[in-house]
């Protein structure tokens, strides 16, 4: 069992793209929902769906075989391909 919160996983993805929570423009999750623990490991999808926007990127939940993480794509055309999700 891999218990995580969206706040933890989003924080990691924000860092990987050179952004931080101060760059967030809007998020569909409440502060409380960001801190709900769920099993992000393989199995069933448990994390609440969301979309989060910064000035540069759009972040969203991704899943494979029940394992959940955060993906992102540029808000504007940047000539960079998006990897398979």
Predicted regions located by residue number:
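Arginine residue identity/basic-tract feature
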Residues: 4-7, 57, 75
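Amphipathic, interaction-prone secondary-structure segments
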Residues: 29-66
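Compact, glycine/acidic-enriched structural inserts
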Residues: 72-85
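Amphipathic alpha-helical scaffolding segments
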Residues: 65-73
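N-terminal domain-onset segments
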Residues: 1-39
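Low-complexity, compositionally biased segments
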Residues: 26, 42, 79-81
